[in-house]
């Protein structure tokens, strides 16, 4: 591709409204342009990368036995009513009516459509298992779209759905998708980690996320230092306490704490160790008999809201009680609540139940109890894992301790079970002629999100540093003062022809532009390999080659360049 015939659209300045590196560089490199909040057009450079990502995803899905289809982005609202998600999904689901006053949605996901399709097309167990996928635009009306295509309202996604008669075949397909996803991200040259995950609003039981590792990642990954165990922080299991509860050595006493409304203030003002304090959090209950529930975590721990949401006594989705509700039920504000004499169900994290001589609110404004002990000052309560894990704690497989890394979720696989097939009565006849509800799996890859995640992981102060497999172009040709030298023009044209015929994707900068601008654009675009041609190179018979990732420069004889570049690709 000649730059003179191409829509390059690079920018020198970093856009003021772009918060993360990928958004900044996608705008500066002329990959995308904003049309409205969370809506972007892909310019040629961005589309080339997007298509390469798509191609790898498609090849690996096909290799794993999945079959490609295409479903509509616009979906009948009736299907969402049938599964109950019309009401459950919330305002992210963009709804509208057509001229006949029929309800429709812009699809954020396609479980309803695919289940409706399969219940009409598949009737016998002999047609199963079946794994269908599409690469399609999705729409979620995010309340605050941000980070460019990382969290946009409209995005491109590969979503696959499998249908099964038995758990055994669901397990097999799930493992095949796990392997396919690992192959996808490996082929793209990305550092990634699969982790155990919560199923969220999609539902189901077993679930893994695939994260591209990046310091800017929104998700916190907890992984084992001694094994392959890894989980999203929401899913990571906290270890059970190994030490027994200590003996009571302090008497229960009430302390005036008018200026200590937080754990940090209590620790600072009264010198109590933070691990000897507890936080009491009041949430909405799941029943009329218990409209409020108290959750207890140690002062140095954080409540895991995903775990808390799954507690039987707690209303889902999790909702914290308001100040007025708390004051009406307890007689004190949020900064003075504690479990002693609290008249509501209490669930404590396992670590809280082995505490002794601890401090908590006294359920009276401006007062705390110190020296609280279980079975003396209050009865033991229900225990559960309701906290986030901490670095250095033992992992559940017993093979190491937790360490943390940040990641960007780019893939998610689920075993849905019969959640959607049962709701929509998607059945087949088994070998005995008996009707059976199908089991389902679903498997998503954020195609457009991968582009941004790859940039977050691969960039430097000069721009993007693309892995070769998804770079918009693989080789750049930079002729110095081409329009002043016929020799440079002829040599550059011949090289462009030679490299193109050899199968390289070449960006040939044939503009009448200053060398500094040409170099800056090539580095901003992140082209992995650059070849420089000037009169001096022609005199010596060697090209100047530069590797974008390492910055290393090498002089390569004219006749050896093609073989040299092929060797670089094999190494990459």
UniProtKB/Swiss-Prot annotation:
One of its GO terms (biological process) is prolyl-tRNA aminoacylation. It is an enzyme of class 6 (ligase). InterPro entries: aa-tRNA-synt_IIb, aa-tRNA-synth_II, aa-tRNA-synth_II/BPL/LPL, Anticodon-bd, Anticodon-bd_dom_sf, Pro-tRNA-ligase_IIa, Pro-tRNA-synth_IIa_bac-type, Pro-tRNA-Synthase_IIa_type1. GO terms for cellular component: cytosol. It catalyses: tRNA(Pro) + L-proline + ATP = L-prolyl-tRNA(Pro) + AMP + diphosphate. Keywords: Aminoacyl-tRNA synthetase, ATP-binding, Cytoplasm, Ligase, Nucleotide-binding, Protein biosynthesis. The keyword DNA repair does not apply. Consists of three domains: the N-terminal catalytic domain, the editing domain and the C-terminal anticodon-binding domain. Belongs to the class-II aminoacyl-tRNA synthetase family. ProS type 1 subfamily. Catalyzes the attachment of proline to tRNA(Pro) in a two-step reaction: proline is first activated by ATP to form Pro-AMP and then transferred to the acceptor end of tRNA(Pro). As ProRS can inadvertently accommodate and process non-cognate amino acids such as alanine and cysteine, to avoid such errors it has two additional distinct editing activities against alanine. One activity is designated as 'pretransfer' editing and involves the tRNA(Pro)-independent hydrolysis of activated Ala-AMP. This is Proline--tRNA ligase. It comes from Shewanella amazonensis (strain ATCC BAA-1098 / SB2B). The lineage of its organism: Bacteria, Pseudomonadati, Pseudomonadota, Gammaproteobacteria, Alteromonadales.
